[in-house]
Amino acid sequence: IRDLRRSRGLGDVYKRRELVVRLNCQRTKHGLLDLEAIASNKLKVKAIMLPKVKTPDEITFIDDMLTDCGLDTDLHVIMETNQALESIYDIAHSSDRIVALYFGGEDMAAELRVENKLENLVYARSRLVHAGASKGVDVIDVPYLNLEDMEGMKKEAQFVKNLGFTGKGSIHPKQISILNEIFTPTEEEISKAKRIMDQFKKANTGLVVIDGKLIERPVLREMQRKLLVANKINKS
């Protein structure tokens, strides 16, 4: 009975999680076999993660395949090649299935012939943020690999958040709570977002003044995103 209760509890937890399957590179034999397995079995997962994407055509091909299979699977795309860096805007807009863009720091640093340090990859990260913002999708930073340097991870996470990233990957459970704290909207941010939303509803104009500061309508999308994130966190 105890095991049954425990299994039910775990089941409830997993119901609140999204299953994302990372495939091998789609330009390799193993990647094509992964895609074949999804197509032949009509595997229903929330999303598939695509590494080392280089061109929009790769995304279009996979989108068409999923459509032919009758699957509504989302796509998570990792930018970790120089070719992808130059094409990331077009890649981001190549499919409505794309809901998240990821930054692959190790491979990107190797391609750019630089050390994988934060200051060396600000430009590449910024290009990804701009592409993600133009599409209105999440932008997720590469995990911090030093498990003993929690302070370093905090600083890097805060930096990329300020840059425009909406999240950061993790490689160990002990990193998760810290990252959630950084990327989850604070009570103050939530309250401000609600005030801005309410003011625009009442004003029915393109701008409002809150606390003496002029706020224009384009800000609404970010306020909506913060409230959606906060609502999702509260339900988890």
Question: In which residue ranges do the predicted regions lie?
Answer:
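Expand to "…catalyze enediolate/carbanion chemistry for C-C bond making/breaking, isomerization
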Residues: 2, 8, 12-236
